[in-house]
Amino acid sequence: MTELEKNVREKFRFITKTLIEKKLTITTMESCTSGLVASLLTDTEGASAVLKGAFITYSNEAKIKQNVPAEVIEKFGVYSEETALEMALAAKRAYSADIAVGVTGTMGNVDPSNNDSVPGEVFFAIAHKEGTVSRHITVPVMDSRYEYKLYVAGVIADEITGVM
């Protein structure tokens, strides 16, 4: 296990335990991380008490089917803070969760399906009881797609920790 993976797994262990203690629930709508955030949340025993469900919406069509407004994707692009925010809000509504994460972006190479694709550009948002947070990050070059996903999940973990 790499140091990156070890650190990210520890962050999510802390998050899941804290959510259990605080009796808070969480959900995700993930694109570029392919469900890794939800998966990491469930690696700690008792996660079923906090993870209400999750969506992997890898395509634009999947996002729209889960109530991300097509108009937002058309106006701002699928890779935008606005789309990430709508993903978080749609997931939050779907599961009535206390915290919801939406994440979209391009990892190591250009997405031929979307003109606004820039490798390493990731957008995520967190909707919670007090409001919303959205971020745009540039992911450094990594050796594998898994490492890209881990890196992004780690950044998201830091933001989740800040809103719990």
PLM regions: where:
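Short alpha-helical segments enriched in small residues
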Residues: 1-164
